């Protein structure tokens, strides 16, 4: 009896000590082992659990059963998703993996310190185009610095010549980036995206506006059609407009039996079918139209030829006049004509 009472007294203490290290593992997955303190706590709890199980096997089995019942009771408060994701065996395997430092989540490799310093050396207060030019220049200098130690071991390598060429190239690159910044090429790298987005937005807006207008016009047309049908159904035939009655009359075909016995039978029978005659002569009319078009074109060409010939004759006449007057300037007759008239007493 005493042994039974002692075991019953010791069971709650054992379950309490066993629940303490397992309490963090009952939380959601966000509490995975990531810190050293948490790993130490887990290892300490597992060691205590092993000590308790090793000291008394019967008590260990009873504690394991109590722990399973407690975990099942606590699992009722969890969502089905958490129950499916975090079973006890998987949780224990996670603990063992974390203690063995196996299958840990691997993070990305850190950036090279030179690259971070390269970005930090560029001021944030500069414009985007200026920062891009400075980044190009700094990248070239960084590449030269990293290339220099590899080339030192090569044969016939001159460090001074290499540095001189690198400095000259850096100066040329600086002038080139300045020129790109002045002519606006670097600014286009940041403006084209916004322009394309603005153009796409304006195009979408215009398309939506056109679609809206189309729907409005279609609705308006349907409304006018309904109004016309309503008017035609309500207005009697006597009050219809003259144009509509005329169209109706032209569409009606007269039955020949209505005028067979009339006095105008012979006249109507001898009346030629002008519509048929015109339809038969459609080909002739088409040829006449082509001939008239050709005549009109030839007349236009003759008019243009006459205009060109008159202009050419005027030009030739002006040239002949100029040449004839130039020849008369050196003639003695023209010089004599240019002499002033002498006074009358001298002639006497």
UniProtKB/Swiss-Prot annotation:
A Pfam short name: MIS13
Subcellular location: Nucleus; Chromosome, Centromere, Kinetochore
Residues covered by region (Disordered): 1-105, 325-348
Covalent link (Glycyl lysine isopeptide (Lys-Gly) (interchain with G-Cter in SUMO2)) residue numbers: 253
UniProt KW keywords: Cell cycle, Cell division, Centromere, Chromosome, Chromosome partition, Isopeptide bond, Kinetochore, Mitosis, Nucleus, Phosphoprotein, Ubl conjugation
Gene Ontology CC: one annotated term: fibrillar center
Modification sites for Phosphoserine: 25, 75, 79, 107, 123, 331
The UniProt record lists the keyword Phosphoprotein: yes
Superkingdom of origin organism: Eukaryota
Biased composition (Basic and acidic residues): 87-104
Residue spans crossing the bilayer: none
Example of a GO biological process term: attachment of spindle microtubules to kinetochore
Biased composition (Low complexity): 338-348
Bias type Polar residues, positions: 33-46, 70-86
Coiled coil regions in record: none
Quaternary structure annotation from Swiss-Prot or TrEMBL: Component of the MIS12 complex composed of MIS12, DSN1, NSL1 and PMF1. Also interacts with KNL1, CBX3 and CBX5. Interacts with KNSTRN.
Function according to Swiss-Prot or TrEMBL: Part of the MIS12 complex which is required for normal chromosome alignment and segregation and kinetochore formation during mitosis.
Record-given protein name: Kinetochore-associated protein DSN1 homolog
Species, as recorded: Mus musculus
The organism's taxonomic lineage, starting at the top: Eukaryota, Metazoa, Chordata, Craniata, Vertebrata
């Amino acid at each position: 009896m005493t042994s039974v009472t002692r075991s019953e007294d010791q069971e709650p203490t054992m379950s309490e000590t066993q629940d303490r290290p397992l309490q963090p593992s009952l939380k959601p997955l966000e509490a995975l082992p990531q810190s050293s303190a948490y790993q130490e706590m887990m290892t300490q709890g597992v060691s205590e659990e092993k000590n308790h199980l090793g000291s008394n096997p019967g008590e260990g089995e009873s504690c394991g059963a109590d722990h399973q019942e407690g975990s099942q009771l606590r699992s009722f408060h969890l969502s089905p998703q958490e129950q499916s994701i975090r079973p006890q065996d998987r949780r224990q395997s996670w603990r063992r993996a974390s203690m063995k430092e196996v299958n840990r989540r691997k993070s990305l490799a850190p950036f090279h310190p030179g690259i971070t310093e390269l970005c930090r050396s560029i001021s944030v207060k500069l414009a985007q185009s200026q920062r891009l030019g400075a980044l190009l220049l700094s990248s070239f200098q960084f590449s030269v610095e990293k290339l220099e130690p590899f080339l030192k071991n090569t044969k016939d390598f001159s460090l001074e010549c290499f540095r001189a060429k690198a400095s000259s190239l850096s100066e040329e690159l600086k002038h080139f980036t300045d020129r790109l910044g002045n002519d606006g090429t670097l600014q286009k790298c940041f403006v084209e995206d916004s322009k394309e987005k603005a153009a796409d937005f304006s195009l979408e807006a215009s398309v939506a506006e056109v679609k809206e207008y189309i729907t409005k016009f279609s609705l308006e047309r349907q409304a006018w059609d309904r109004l016309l049908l309503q008017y035609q159904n309500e207005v009697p035939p006597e009050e219809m407009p003259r144009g509509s009655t005329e169209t109706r009359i032209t569409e009606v075909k007269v039955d020949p039996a209505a005028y067979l016995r009339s006095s105008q039978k012979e006249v109507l029978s001898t009346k030629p079918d002008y519509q048929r005659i015109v339809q038969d002569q459609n080909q002739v009319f088409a040829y006449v139209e082509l001939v008239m078009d050709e005549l009109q074109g030839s007349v236009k060409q003759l008019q243009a030829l006459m205009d060109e010939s008159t202009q050419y004759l005027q030009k030739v006449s002006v040239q002949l006049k100029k040449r004839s007057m130039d020849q008369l300037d050196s003639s003695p007759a023209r010089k004599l004509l240019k002499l002033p008239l002498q006074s009358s007493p001298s002639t006497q």
